[in-house]
């Protein structure tokens, strides 16, 4: 990683920029999960029924799905500083509208739906992944990306805890206002401390005077590269069944596991702690000892085993036994595929590639509630396990018959 980075207003060494990026990601994710913890209660307070709440969630997912690739291309062309600053400013706008929707004197339902609009530009995590990808050597990339799991775990645990505690003690608008202040601070830190670009000068010049940020042909060309499409399809197909289960988890925890709200919160905290441990500590070490394709196959295999367990489970204790395997598979699949995909494209396109990767989860959130709800109502929880088992056995068979080649140079 030779070459000089364009200066920021506050000079930081390369390692300092990476650490600050982790901090910014943790702050944004904490605010995001604070929002997730109050949205159901705010919706109920404003009189939304379950159908309207579903529309609200779908709107958020669709906007993030559409915005991810475009934001990634913007990050490649305009640099890390502009991308992170824009993401935090969009988040600030979302939380400000959320605060306004809590006021009885204002049209709350309209403002609540309007607060979803900035979600199209809220992509701090992909921007952070781009910074880390640009500033680390390819051999160290999986370990560096896996440390973002610690940030995610911090967001799940502290965001959910703060959201519930503050809304109970000071009102439902308090977490939203705190998130507004924190994301404004994140925008200031991004603008003053993050370099204009984290790409080297020779790489950044490839985008100067190039095509538009909204050039969908350039985005689709990247996705159709020979070493990109197979890995991306594995990422989408293998993770989709577990995504269906996670989308339906709030319903499953109430109906199937018979959990109270507090008990479901404890289970989510357990999930967050496991994710911190596995993604932050386990995956990084495994990536230094085993090839990425071996880790990818192992994640698909564990997905299949967990799917079998889900098909047979009958209570929450069984699910707790399956949870470490589920979290391992989710973490390994996401980290390994992100690393493989960024290595498969040129350094000038890493942001766009990570933006495409970031669209996978919103895709599940968009399609999942309808499909998952239909399967769950018709066949029960076991069908979600059977789908996960069969899909991942099929993916594993394809990977076994036709391995993903890791040879050759990056796409230029």
From Swiss-Prot:
Q: Does the record bear Transmembrane helix in its keywords?
A: yes
**GO BP annotations listed:** monoatomic ion transport; xenobiotic detoxification by transmembrane export across the plasma membrane; xenobiotic transport
Where located? Apical cell membrane
Cite the Pfam families for this sequence. Answer: MFS_1
**GO molecular function terms attached to this record:** symporter activity; ubiquitin protein ligase binding
GO terms under cellular component: apical plasma membrane; cytoplasm; nuclear envelope
Membrane topology is: Multi-pass membrane protein
- Principal subcellular localization: membrane
Residue spans crossing the bilayer: 16-36, 51-71, 117-137, 148-168, 176-196, 232-252, 264-284, 294-314, 316-336, 380-400
Which cysteine pairs are covalently linked by disulfides here?
none
Query: Which SUPFAM superfamilies would you find in this protein's record?
Result: MFS general substrate transporter
Q: Which UniProt keywords apply?
A: Cell membrane, Ion transport, Membrane, Symport, Transmembrane, Transmembrane helix, Transport
Q: Which protein family is named in the record?
A: Belongs to the major facilitator (TC 2.A.1) superfamily. Organic cation transporter (TC 2.A.1.19) family.
Under PANTHER family, the record lists: SOLUTE CARRIER FAMILY 22 MEMBER 18
Could you tell me what this protein does? Answer: May act as a transporter of organic cations based on a proton efflux antiport mechanism. May play a role in the transport of chloroquine and quinidine-related compounds in kidney. Plays a role in the regulation of lipid metabolism.
Q: What is this protein's name?
A: Solute carrier family 22 member 18
Taxonomic classification, please? Eukaryota, Metazoa, Chordata, Craniata, Vertebrata
Q: Which gene encodes it?
A: Slc67a1
């Amino acid at each position: 990683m030779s070459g000089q980075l364009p200066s920021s207003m506050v000079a930081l060494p390369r390692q300092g920029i990476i650490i600050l990026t982790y901090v910014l990601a943790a702050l944004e994710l904490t605010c995001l999960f604070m929002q997730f913890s109050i949205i159901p209660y705010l919706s109920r307070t404003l009189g939304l029924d379950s159908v309207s709440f579903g529309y609200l969630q779908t709107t958020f997912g669709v906007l993030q799905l559409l915005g991810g690739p475009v934001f990634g291309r913007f990050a490649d062309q305009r640099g890390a500083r502009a991308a992170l600053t824009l993401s935090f400013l969009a988040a600030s706008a979302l939380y400000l509208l959320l605060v306004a929707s809590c006021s009885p004197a204002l049209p709350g339902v309209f403002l609540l739906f309007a607060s979803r609009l900035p979600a199209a530009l809220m992509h701090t995590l992909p921007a952070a992944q781009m910074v880390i990808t640009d500033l680390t050597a390819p051999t160290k990339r999986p370990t560096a990306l896996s440390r973002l799991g610690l940030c995610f775990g911090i967001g799940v645990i502290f965001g959910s805890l703060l959201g519930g505690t503050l809304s109970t003690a000071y009102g439902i608008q308090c977490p939203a206002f705190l998130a507004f202040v924190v994301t404004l601070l994140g925008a200031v830190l991004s603008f003053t401390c993050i370099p204009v670009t984290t790409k080297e000068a020779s790489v950044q010049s490839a985008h100067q005077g190039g095509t538009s940020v909204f050039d969908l042909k350039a985005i689709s060309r990247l996705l159709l590269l020979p070493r990109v499409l197979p890995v991306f399809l594995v990422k989408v197909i293998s993770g989709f069944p577990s995504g269906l289960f996670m989308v339906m988890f709030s319903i499953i925890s109430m109906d199937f596991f018979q959990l109270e709200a507090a008990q479901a919160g404890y289970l989510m905290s357990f999930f967050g702690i496991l994710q911190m441990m596995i993604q932050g500590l386990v995956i990084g070490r495994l990536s230094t000892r085993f090839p990425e394709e071996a880790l990818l196959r192992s994640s698909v295999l564990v997905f299949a085993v967990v799917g079998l367990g889900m098909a047979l489970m009958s209570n929450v204790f069984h699910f707790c036994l399956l949870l470490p395997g589920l979290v391992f598979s989710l973490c390994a699949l996401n980290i390994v595929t992100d690393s493989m995909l960024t290595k498969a494209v040129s350094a000038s396109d890493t942001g766009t590639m990570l933006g495409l990767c970031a669209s996978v989860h919103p895709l599940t959130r968009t399609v999942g509630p309808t499909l998952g709800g239909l399967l769950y109502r018709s066949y029960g929880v076991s069908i979600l396990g059977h789908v996960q088992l069969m899909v991942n056995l099929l993916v594993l068979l394809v990977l076994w018959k036709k391995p993903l080649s890791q040879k050759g140079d990056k796409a230029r």
